[in-house]
Amino acid sequence: MAPPAMAFQALALGPLPLPLPAARRRRRVRVLAVAADHTPPPPPSPSSPPEPANSPSRLLRELAERKKAVSPKKKHPPRRFILKPPLDDERLTQRFLSSPQLSLKALPLLSSCLPSAPLSAADRTWMDEYLLEAKQALGYPLAPSETLGDGDDDGCPARHFDVLLYLAFQHLDTSCERTRTRHVRSGHSRLWFLGQYVLELAFCEFFLQRYPRESPGPMRERVFALIGKRAIPKWIKAASLHNLVFPYDDLDKMIRKDREPPAKAVFWALFGAIYLCFGMPEVYRVLFEAFGMDPEDESCQPKLRRQLEDVDYVSVEFEKRQLTWQDVAAYRPPPDALFAHPRLFRACVPPGMHRFRGNIWDFDNRPKVMNTLGYPLPMNDRIPEITEARNIELGLGLQLCFLHPSKHKFEHPRFCLERLEYVGQKIQDLVMAERLLMKHLDAPGRWLAEKHRRLLMNKYCGRYLRDKHLHHYIIYGESVQDRFEHNRRLRNPSTTAVQQAIHGLAYCVYGKPDVRRLMFEVFDFEQVQPKAV
């Protein structure tokens, strides 16, 4: 008998006594694919009957088409980033000679806002279809503007109104090929770039004369409520122009981000065109007649604030009644007037400023300031007394430009530079915009707006005044003088305000040409003059 260990070994090496059924040892193999010939079958002949949708041959043919190697499409850069070779001299000369922008020598600003290329057939088609509707809504005669003026007199600005009015309505629409052409796109953007500053100056002059005792803060609120971007679509619809701006959309159902930018661009460009062709009086007529704006409407009133008591006199022409837009638009200064804009000067410089005549500042600092600014300018007056009176008023206006609000504003709210600063800020914006338009004929409006913003930054305005060492003559209140003179966070805005007030005074006394002289010759805003070593 074998030992137990050997018995266990024999048991372990032997087969199991329980046989498994043969059916369970089979493995089930499932067919997951069908082997097929990968060569595509020939296409069916036209005479053969159409194959059903689930035909194997049709499915194999489509699979073979999908398996074909397709090279990936190369991603080309956008067209605006593709560098083009410069034009040769002959083509460049031809382009400039055929450009309408160089066709008017007598009207350089209007000429610079004309399209950079002649209008195409698509442009003329739009003008034939829709221009009469726009002119009727704005209150203009329906005859073509080319018939205005004497004969072939291109010096008449109104002759170019049809072209500029067409450009004003061509806001950029990505689905419209006509508005994406270069001469239309740039022409429209250049018009809205000019028009925004025209509107700001128009309302500034109007409100300064309508509210002779009010500070500029409430006036800015009125302007924003009237022509802010939220209110502009309402005015577009009030003038029945919404079908021209949004021909395929319902203005009331559009969301804000789709409705406001095109309406704002068309509104600004419209007043740029009107200003170029007819001047500022026509801007007032279209604002208050065609669009129906009401400065006394409840929606555009400034918020209530604590008002300082104004005990000083205003000029006689403002005491009788409140001026209307017709008074401002129809006003023409008399031939022997002291100033270029007499009523605007009276609205900004109170009559009580004569009490400061002959004080220490007038005796010590006024001659130095006038010498730096090149005042008084030579004028051809019939009567010498007119020249003398103008120079006296100019000296008082200069003293008001340097009169900081901390000095007298609490007791006498208008004995400070705020109202002159308001008009100066708007006129310097417009003068710089006109300068950039005439200087950069090819530039679109967005590029000009960025250039304009960089040239007129507040820190630069004050710096130009400090470069002329005029900030030493600012009259501060005794309690804050040390802080303003030694803290640049306080000093820089105050010098900027004085700079803008000087521009406002120059506009009131001598007109827009003197603002250009101060900005580009005296203060050198463009920084192109050589620096003293």
Swiss-Prot record:
Residues covered by the RNase III domain: 164-279, 411-511
Subcellular location: Plastid, Chloroplast
SUPFAM superfamilies cross-referenced by the UniProt entry: RNase III domain-like
Pfam families found in the cross-reference section: Ribonuclease_3
GO cellular component terms, A-Z: chloroplast; nucleus; ribonucleoprotein complex
A Gene Ontology molecular function term of the record: ribonuclease III activity
Keywords carried by this UniProt record: Chloroplast, mRNA processing, mRNA splicing, Plastid, Repeat, Ribonucleoprotein, RNA-binding, Transit peptide
Signal peptide (UniProt feature, chain positions): none
Biased composition, class Pro residues, residue ranges: 39-53
GO BP term, example: RNA processing
Transit peptide stretch: 1-30
InterPro entries per the UniProt record, alphabetical: RNase_III_dom (IPR000999), RNase_III_sf (IPR036389)
Composition bias, Basic residues: 69-82
Subunit structure: Interacts with RNA. Part of large ribonucleo-protein particles that contain CAF1 and/or CAF2.
Function: Binds specific group II introns in chloroplasts and facilitates their splicing. Acts on both subgroup IIA and subgroup IIB introns. The substrates of the subgroup II also require the CRM domain proteins CAF1 or CAF2. Binds both single-stranded and double-stranded RNA non-specifically, but lacks endonuclease activity. Required for plastid ribosome biogenesis.
Protein name (Swiss-Prot/TrEMBL): Ribonuclease III domain-containing protein RNC1, chloroplastic
Species the sequence originates in: Oryza sativa subsp. japonica (Rice)
